[in-house]
Each structure stands twice: as C-alpha cells, then as structure tokens.
C-alpha cells in the first residue's frame, strides 16, 4: 500500500507504467482517501521498484507502513 499524489485523471497513464511489472497481480486506487492510496497485489516484494518507477516519472510514491 502506497501514499501517492496520483490523481484520477492520471490513473490510465500510471497503470501503463505498472503493467511493465509482470509480478503485479492487481492494482487498485483510492482517490477518496487523502493519501491517494495505491494498493497492489504482487508475487514477491517489488516495493522499491514501484516507488522508483513512479518517482522517476514525476509522481510521489511512498510505502505506507
């Protein structure tokens, strides 16, 4: 689960980035949450890879602990 600054209008673009990870099984956004939560289900731990991918494309993305 990640805190992001992704807005609903950018969801499609972000999904394209996330589709590059074959380890991701499911992606869900919660734009009503103040943290614009991104939830992903994966095979294995790719947390840092997701953060790096989104951060390098101009988005804030940090795992919620």
Enumerate the predicted regions with their spans:
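Short Gly/Ser/Thr- and Asp/Glu-enriched loop/turn motifs at secondary-structure junctions
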Residues: 31-35
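Short glycine-/aliphatic-rich beta-strand segments at the starts of folded cytosolic domains
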Residues: 1-6
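Helix N-cap motif at beta-to-alpha junctions
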Residues: 42-47
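Short amphipathic alpha-helices in soluble, non-transmembrane regions
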Residues: 13-20, 49-58
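Residue-level signal for inorganic ion chemistry
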Residues: 38
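Short acidic amphipathic segments
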Residues: 18, 24-30
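Conserved short beta-strand edge segments in small beta-sheet-based binding/regulatory domains
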Residues: 27-29, 57-65
């Amino acid at each position: 689960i990640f805190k992001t600054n992704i807005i609903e209008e950018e969801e499609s673009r972000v999904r394209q980035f996330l589709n590059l990870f074959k380890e991701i099984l499911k992606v869900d956004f919660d734009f009503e949450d103040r943290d614009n939560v991104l939830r992903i289900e994966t095979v294995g731990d790719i947390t840092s890879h997701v953060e790096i991918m989104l951060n390098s494309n101009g988005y804030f993305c940090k795992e919620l602990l």
